[in-house]
Amino acid sequence: AEFDALPRLLGRATVEIRTSQGDLTAVIDGYSAPLTGGAFVDLVERGFYDGLPFSRAEDFYVLQSGNPKGNAEGFIDPKTKQERHVPLEILVPGDTSPIYNMTFEDLGLFKATPVLPFATLGTLGWAHSDKALDDGSSQFFFFLYEAELTPAGLNLVDGRNAAFGYVVEGSEVLKEMTMDDTIISAKVISGSENLKSHA
């Protein structure tokens, strides 16, 4: 199939992210986002995120990281020498497998909430460019949910970006972070056996 060469997470994994503001623990949900979760856990295991800075995109209330040093904007796969891209991956409630490279708008789902919604502080999302849905490679963001700024069901990222996990410890650290902060290290503390390098 089309995405067989991509890593996948068949289950859950727990990742500890040490930052210059403090430590976060995140659970990555490969049941609902196998390719996105797989790409993230694979990059964590490669040490890709260690030392990378944060950038902030105010309009979405997110704190973003994963842009490598140098000219590349994503992860260059040493095997192919190309930037590895992950398709937009969203699981619609009631479906058994995710839909790829279609926003909820494309699907006409204007009121639907994905199985993994951007509904809490510290939801992990996968970034892609404005130009394409399938060019996300390594950049991810923490959703900085604020109820008064994000009326239920009206945030702009549900159905447009893949959520792939949640911060379960350290969400107060997120509130303190700025663009001056960095990821010191990220490591998988459980569930690494659920990572498969391809289909």
Write out the residue ranges for each language-model feature:
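Cyclophilin-like peptidyl-prolyl cis-trans isomerases
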Residues: A1-A199
